[in-house]
Amino acid sequence: MLLTDRNTSGTTFTLLGFSDYPELQVPLFLVFLAIYNVTVLGNIGLIVIIKINPKLHTPMYFFLSQLSFVDFCYSSIIAPKMLVNLVVKDRTISFLGCVVQFFFFCTFVVTESFLLAVMAYDRFVAICNPLLYTVNMSQKLCVLLVVGSYAWGVSCSLELTCSALKLCFHGFNTINHFFCEFSSLLSLSCSDTYINQWLLFFLATFNEISTLLIVLTSYAFIVVTILKMRSVSGRRKAFSTCASHLTAITIFHGTILFLYCVPNSKNSRHTVKVASVFYTVVIPMLNPLIYSLRNKDVKDTVTEILDTKVFSY
């Protein structure tokens, strides 16, 4: 059924965001603006560093550049609107705008989840079968894995978005959140949302279980391989290689699991908002910091660039 047939084309929503704390609007704006600026500079900077340094043209850094791009994208989908709503009184968003925001946000979050799983598999091949690493992780395979992650992200998002377009809304629609979350739309709809809820549950469960299964299986083999190494320096190097990725995975999946384990009650809305801020705004900022601060190649490239700029003047 077409969108106009459901009388939703002119529907608007009000995003409450953090309006419960009017005295914190300006401080929150300044904090989130700083975080978003660091996110943009960090992720774009990491992509540029990987691009200009031939030493970083490896599968691991190829996946890392894609992760930085995804982090930049899904943060940019949420943060600007959230920042605007912190300083203006009119916090409305059209139904179409809400659906578009959800579509792109869902696409990039699902893509990130599978990219992290792909990166775990890459570490598994590099540590457990290093002699055949360049053969097994060919450029063609790397591109296919990334394209597959994006394609699945778009597919999941399309299914949920199409189901949202069939919903009907009436009256005053207030979303007690700072972005258009799918479950929030379902709670406001006057349509039967049974199928939508099951579709959301199925896709979320499948994505989380499948990606975590890949990650846990990969790292189980990695741990066994590392423990079999006789060289202490070899063990230390292997653990160091995986530390950044494990940190990123723990923060990302830990936050999402915590978020969806919180009971959907009025008393938990504050907790849900805080957790949502963490994985929509904070995590995209942390990822480039996590990977660059613990990575000698990245730090060396940054040092070379800075030295070149200094001596050029």
UniProtKB/Swiss-Prot annotation:
Mention one GO molecular function. olfactory receptor activity
Topological domains, Extracellular: 1-26, 77-100, 162-197, 260-272
Q: Which Pfam families match?
A: 7tm_4
Regions of this protein lying in the Cytoplasmic compartment: 48-55, 122-140, 219-238, 294-313
Q: Does Zinc-finger count among this protein's keywords? A: no
Example of a GO cellular component annotation carried by this entry: plasma membrane
Which residues get glycosylated?
7
Ranges in a coiled coil: none
Main site of residence? membrane
Extract the InterPro entries matched here: GPCR_Rhodpsn (IPR000276), GPCR_Rhodpsn_7TM (IPR017452), Olfact_rcpt (IPR000725)
Sorted UniProt keywords: Cell membrane, Disulfide bond, G-protein coupled receptor, Glycoprotein, Membrane, Olfaction, Receptor, Sensory transduction, Transducer, Transmembrane, Transmembrane helix
- Disulfide bridges in this chain: 98-190
Q: A GO biological process this protein is involved in?
A: G protein-coupled receptor signaling pathway
Q: How does it sit in the membrane?
A: Multi-pass membrane protein
Compartment(s) of residence: Cell membrane
- Which residues span the membrane? 27-47, 56-76, 101-121, 141-161, 198-218, 239-259, 273-293
What is the purpose of this protein? Odorant receptor.
Family membership noted in the UniProt record: Belongs to the G-protein coupled receptor 1 family.
- Name by which UniProt lists this protein: Olfactory receptor 5D18
Which species is this UniProt entry from? Homo sapiens
Record lineage? Eukaryota, Metazoa, Chordata, Craniata, Vertebrata
User: What is the gene name?
Assistant: OR5D18
